[in-house]
Amino acid sequence: GTFDHFEKDAVVMTGGERVTADMAILAIGWELGIPFLPDSYQKKLVDPDGQYRLYRLIANPDLPDMGFVGFNSSFCTVLNAEMAANWLARYADGQLARQPSTEDMRRNIEMMLHWRRNERPAAGVYGGLCVAPFHFKHFDELLDDMGAKVRRRGALTEKFTPPDADAFARYLASVPDYRVQ
């Protein structure tokens, strides 16, 4: 069968087969959606207008055991996913240099939803998950949260040039060392 739903330690297929798993990776391509999640999760994650309730476009404080890497639209998808994966590993283990409280996350989500709906409604096509053309701001927030010591220089120049993956590798390397336990 195909994927039907999650259980505590397994993925259950449509034919009833249980596949034991420590992790499940969703690779949806370009069609946005998470139809396999229970309605109770959907209601916490997606507003009626299709906007996703995600802090840093990665995590929802009301679904603490779930996070999304590469779920948001970007012109530099691989770099975006790499930054998000590093952020999510630290967030999930409570190891961000600036670990947000649940209330801080909710306030930020509300502020960003208001901004997207009122200032950038065109991004609604992407569930509000498009960081283009705001890559640098998004990456700066993730790096700040992780405690990066090396930061961008010449931000004005960078705004008019493509993202430099090598530079972001240096910024990420300046984050306090952390290995998932």
Language model regions located:
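Flavin (primarily FAD) cofactor-binding/catalytic cores of flavoenzymes
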Residues: 1-101, 120-181
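Short catalytic/ligand-gating loop segments at beta-alpha or beta-beta junctions
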Residues: 100-108
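Extended repeat-based interaction scaffolds and adjacent low-complexity, acidic/S/T/P-biased segments
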Residues: 111-112
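Activation targets extended, charge/polar-rich intrinsically disordered C-terminal tails
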Residues: 115-117
